[in-house]
Amino acid sequence: MIIADNIKQFHSIRNSLIKQQKIGFVPTMGALHNGHISLIKKAKSENDVVIVSIFVNPTQFNNPNDYQTYPNQLQQDIQILASLDVDVLFNPSEKDIYPDGNLLRIEPKLEIANILEGKSRPGHFSGMLTVVLKLLQITKPNNLYLGEKDYQQVMLIKQLVKDFFINTKIIVCPTQRQPSGLPLSSRNKNLTSTDIEIANKIYEILRQDDFSNLEELTNKINSTGAKLQYIQKLNNRIFLAFYIGKVRLIDNFLKETGPSC
């Protein structure tokens, strides 16, 4: 596996690739888990070259504490990527991605950008779309692999690719879950054993609910010791975000299936 720690190194690697080679790209913020691994394996099966990026993007965090406490396990991540035969790890610094600071940003005007996560985390989608555009311009992949767990993010990136005429196909992969139904997330690494017990109770409640009374469901979730930030039905999906202690988790799933594995 080749590791590029800056854009100049990456461009040299990217330019050396044969034009006919199909390139798959999996953007991450590190702290890799089986959800990321499933994306990488999918990319490996469909491309000649797989690029994974690790960059914790500061502009998509509206809470400084969330940014400061985001899990960092770079050496472990490198071992995971090497074991998966990833071809290139792009691990840029903030200075690489924002050489002149955060001077230009994508400001989404779509309705989906202003509800749920957009409403709860002002500026999040702007920062996310800005860095995704930068990463796509740098990596120039044929295929981009994203997880369904970040559903709003996926919808906005699809619009980004369309509006900026980016010649990249987006492949959306199913959310990977623990046996309890809890979606895999890098932030899960910050959960204590007690927090995990609370999360398991929440997903036991969710698996048994028919989502006909969200107020009653809110009370049930809050009774576990968690703090529900929102739960909402949108089309045929259930979206929710909640805190367990200081850890914020999000999820979405089809109403008919619930949070099934």
UniProtKB/Swiss-Prot annotation:
Broadest EC class assigned to this enzyme: ligase
Lineage top rank: taxon: Bacteria
Keywords: ATP-binding, Cytoplasm, Ligase, Nucleotide-binding, Pantothenate biosynthesis
Single GO BP term: pantothenate biosynthetic process
Sequence positions that bind beta-alanine: Q60
Transmembrane segments: none
Residue sites binding (R)-pantoate per the record: Q60, Q153
UniProt subcellular location: Cytoplasm
Reactions that this protein is recorded to catalyse: (R)-pantoate + beta-alanine + ATP = (R)-pantothenate + AMP + diphosphate + H(+)
EC annotation from Swiss-Prot or TrEMBL: 6.3.2.1
Signal peptide: none
Cited Pfam families: Pantoate_ligase
Note in the entry: The reaction proceeds by a bi uni uni bi ping pong mechanism.
Functional summary from the UniProt entry: Catalyzes the condensation of pantoate with beta-alanine in an ATP-dependent reaction via a pantoyl-adenylate intermediate.
Protein name per UniProt: Pantothenate synthetase
Lineage: Bacteria, Pseudomonadati, Pseudomonadota, Gammaproteobacteria, Thiotrichales
